[in-house]
Amino acid sequence: MSLCRLLLMLAMCCGVSRGSQTLPAGGRRGQRRRDNSAQWSTQQRPEGAVGPAPLTDVVTAAGTRTVPDVDQAGAVLVRQYNLVTSPLGLATLGSTNALLYAAPVSPLMPLQDGTTSNIMSTESSNYAQYRVQGLTVRWRPVVPNAVGGFSISMAYWPQTTSTPTSIDMNSITSTDVRVVLQPGSAGLLTIPHERLAYKNNGWRSVETVSVPQEDATSGMLMVCVHGTPWNSYTNSVYTGPLGMVDFAIKLQLRNLSPGNTNARVTRVKVTAPHTIKADPSGATITTAAAARFMADVRWGLGTAEDGEIGHGILGVLFNLADTVLGGLPSTLLRAASGQYMYGRPVGNANGEPEVKLYMSVEDAVNDKPIMVPHDIDLGTSTVTCQDYGNQHVDDRPSPAPAPKRALGTLRSGDVLRITGSMQYVTNAELLPQSVSQGYFGAGSTMMVHNLITGVRAPASSVDWTKATVDGVQVKTVDASSGSNRFAALPAFGKPAVWGPQGAGYFYQYNSTHQEWIYFLQNGSSVVWYAYTNMLGQKSDTSILFEVRPIQASDQPWFLAHHTGGDDCTTCLPLGLRTCCRQAPEDQSPETRRLLDRLSRTFPSPP
């Protein structure tokens, strides 16, 4: 090998080696690769050179992460709660198939047995929706080894909110989320995720007013005893506790819009000396926590109307010491151990904010307050008043209702009811064409009621010749004789007749055509066809019919008129010099191009 060739090969190798080690301009050494698998829950704004906005001075701190500027709408709070009950025993000794514990899975579950410091009384009250992401239930037995003759079952119903009427073993096995335990055996039941998220991906409403129960709870959990616990050592019925139920629940909480929280305005908490006063009209409590609700225009002192359940009703939450709970009357202890009640603001003689207490929402609606035998001094305690419905007029104004559709603006499917006194006539001047006899009613006494929109008015208040059905003007016909004109309103089939003596419809043999209801031009009369006076010469009658759409055969639709020459009034406005209805050899070039384009756009069916 010559020396020149050897030097050339060495130069090529060195060049390749240097090229592989040299980074191009703007190399990526030291830069982190972007993780394309990351799931972004919020959309972060792009960062500029000096900050999120121009001319923003940025001051950072070493070792401190800047809070990102993101939209918090829909941010999800994740919390885990571990709840445990007191030792559970049979309420009725010797009973079988008894219910030890039953509760809907929701934020209203108590944080500790014996109190109602529930999940809702914590930060979850600031959110609108919750979702049970995971739920594990554990049974911890406390029975001695000598006790037997029974079994424990834990069962979960994902789509129910009430306990079954029978809790025998057949009912327990009707759900596939269950476990049956022998005496003294500990158990663990993990609820499958698909059972917790069976609707709306598991999201449930934190609010309970005007919300179906299945939309405010994730399901029902039941712990039952089957058989009779028997103490073989004493040869008698076992009367002690059987065990405890331990919950491990993982919750997700979210709001549907920023600031949509109960704690914003509608939840007021006051710590002060409080006293529940006994009154012949019901127990009351004077608290500054209710001052905000006294001035609300929605919180009237009258009774709630139908459909207004939850409006005008407060949730009154007490945070009392356990020592005080021992002195509460049983009537208060039944209301969530005396810590959560409902109230309605009443105000006292001194103008102080006062709330009347109730056991439930239904009692508050029906004004059936709690009765206590004497005043109860709560000492310095915390009372929280929150809007049970979270529907203040001041806080969340309701949108104005949409205006009603006018009676003459009809849609197909509208149901009209025409009521009044009618007379059977055969006078041609009072009847439209093709109607030889029928019932005639004066428009001032005939009431027309659109049952779909709720609009009701006399027939004479509408110019029926200008009425429309789905935007199409109704057909008008002349009278059989004379100058009267009638507006013809199409109906599906035969109008139903409702009279004082009976109901039905007129049937004419071999007549299958659609019917019509006729209104005189000024609405002064209503006419409908009847081939006989079977209702009598005069009758107070109602007719009921459904409006059908106006068909092409009902309205005089005409095809466009073409002259076939250069003076076509249909084609000239379209920019064509000659009529398109000409022989192909006589058509202008732009007409042929237009027809060719139309044939490609709208091809003829095969």
Swiss-Prot record:
A Pfam family annotated for this UniProt entry: SP2_M
Superkingdom of this protein's organism: Viruses
InterPro entries reported in the protein's UniProt record: SP2_M, SP2_N, Viral_coat
Signal peptide positions (record): 1-19
Annotated region described as particle formation, given as residue ranges: 313-339
Disordered: annotated segments: 22-54
Keywords for the protein's UniProt record, in alphabetical order: Capsid protein, Glycoprotein, Host cytoplasm, Host endoplasmic reticulum, Host Golgi apparatus, Host nucleus, RNA-binding, Secreted, Signal, T=1 icosahedral capsid protein, Virion
Glycan-bearing residues: 255, 510
Gene Ontology cellular component terms for the protein in this record: extracellular region; host cell endoplasmic reticulum; host cell Golgi apparatus; host cell nucleus; host cell surface; T=1 icosahedral viral capsid
Residue ranges of the motif Nuclear localization signal: 28-34
GO molecular function: RNA binding; structural molecule activity
Family note: Belongs to the hepevirus capsid protein family.
Domain text: The Arginine-Rich Motif (ARM) acts as a nuclear localization signal that drives the nuclear translocation of isoform capsid protein.
Any further remark recorded for this protein: The viral particles present in feces and bile are non-enveloped, while those in circulating blood and culture supernatants are covered with a cellular membrane (quasi-enveloped).
Protein name stated in the entry: Pro-secreted protein ORF2
Record organism: Avian hepatitis E virus (isolate Chicken/California/Meng)
